[in-house]
Swiss-Prot record:
InterPro entries: Ppm1/Ppm2/Tcmp, SAM-dependent_MTases_sf, SAM_mthyl_Trfase_ML2640-like. PANTHER family: S-ADENOSYL-L-METHIONINE-DEPENDENT METHYLTRANSFERASE YKTD-RELATED, S-ADENOSYL-L-METHIONINE-DEPENDENT METHYLTRANSFERASES SUPERFAMILY PROTEIN. It comes from the Bacteria. It comes from Mycobacterium ulcerans (strain Agy99). Its EC number is 2.1.1.-. GO terms for molecular function: methyltransferase activity. Keywords: Methyltransferase, S-adenosyl-L-methionine, Transferase. S-adenosyl-L-methionine binds at D131, D160, L161. Exhibits S-adenosyl-L-methionine-dependent methyltransferase activity. Belongs to the UPF0677 family. It is an enzyme of class 2 (transferase). One of its GO terms (biological process) is methylation. SUPFAM superfamilies: S-adenosyl-L-methionine-dependent methyltransferases (SSF53335). This is Putative S-adenosyl-L-methionine-dependent methyltransferase MUL_2766. The lineage of its organism: Bacteria, Bacillati, Actinomycetota, Actinomycetes, Mycobacteriales.
């Protein structure tokens, strides 16, 4: 079902289900023979959500070779390594920020992110998680049931990012006078282009000099390439739906030309370094994801680490 301005979701539907899919990929990566990450909360969270397709994927009952369309450029088989190196990128970002003295972090659209529970945070660290109320409530309750305890001062902020989240964040104790480490992981594609700009504007307005931001973006492509990408994605998910997958990824994102993230941030006073997914995979010894001259694939995603210097 296409997105609407005021749509909402839980972790089994719409945009929320993509967070569960990513957590499933992290769970598989964690259980690999030579794991690139260790996210012990990923599998129990996926099981608790209860989407059969993702549960079978995590347990190995889903045979990926039977599900994937190898010509589409979007394959389940690629996701565990891709999401593992993505997680490592954002983990390292937080570790670098805390080593630099940052003691305040904000995880935007936190989904099933368990970093507040699994990373080694320094004393005095405050972590804010922002997401839809149903998502926040489910994860908090489930992790408490598992006996998990946050390793930092965790403040959950149950608000839609399309609402006045800066106000809600401030009311939760956020201090705009202190440097902050922000992450927007797997978020921009689910925002309209103008909302992406507004989010970056709001982050900047709330950030003291020395704040840091990590995010990801898919490069703009000509309209015909975007249409080709949607066609290939629908081809991939059509195969998945034969095995119980119920999402149509092509309906979850927003179309339209987006600002170049690095240039947009530069104009706001941020200095950025971008690393392509293909490079992250190579740096971590993971199998490459082929580029597709006719379309965008996961290999084209760029991961930015930025510092506010103005």
């Amino acid at each position: 079902m296409p997105r609407t301005d005021n749509d909402s979701w839980d972790l089994a539907t719409s945009v929320g289900a993509t967070a569960t899919m990513v957590a499933a990929a992290r769970a598989i990566a964690t259980n690999a023979d030579n794991p690139l990450i260790a996210d012990r909360f990923a599998e129990p969270l996926v099981r608790a959500v209860g989407v059969d397709f993702f549960t079978r994927w995590v347990t190995g009952d889903l045979v990926v070779a039977d599900v994937d369309d190898t010509e589409s450029g979007w394959q389940l088989a690629q996701m565990p390594d891709a999401m593992a190196v993505r997680a490592r990128f954002f983990d390292a970002f937080f570790q670098d920020a805390t080593r630099a003295g940052v003691r305040q972090a904000v995880i935007l659209a936190s989904g099933l992110d368990a970093r507040a529970y699994r990373l080694d945070w320094p004393a005095g660290m405050t972590v804010f998680e922002i997401d839809q109320p149903e998502v926040i409530a489910f994860k908090t309750t489930t992790l408490a049931g598992l006996g998990a305890v946050p390793r930092a001062d965790l403040r959950t902020v149950a608000v839609d990012l399309r609402q006045d989240w800066p106000k809600a964040l401030t009311e939760a104790g956020f201090d705009a006078g202190r440097p902050t480490a922000w992450i927007a992981e797997g978020l921009f594609g689910y925002l309209p282009p103008e909302a992406q700009d507004r989010l970056l504007d709001n982050i900047t307005a709330l950030s003291a000099t020395g704040s840091r931001l990590a995010c990801e973006a898919i490069p703009n492509r000509p309209q015909q390439d975007a249409e080709k990408a949607r066609e290939l994605m629908r081809k991939a998910t059509a195969r998945w739906r034969e095995h119980g997958f119920e999402l149509e990824f092509g309906d979850l994102g927003y179309e339209g030309d987006r600002a170049d993230v690095e240039l947009y941030l530069q104009n706001l006073g941020w200095q950025s370094v971008g690393t392509q997914m293909s490079q992250l995979l190579a740096d971590n010894g993971a199998a490459p994801i082929p580029h597709n001259n006719d379309s965008v694939t996961m290999a084209d995603t760029i991961y930015y680490s930025s510092v506010l210097t103005a």
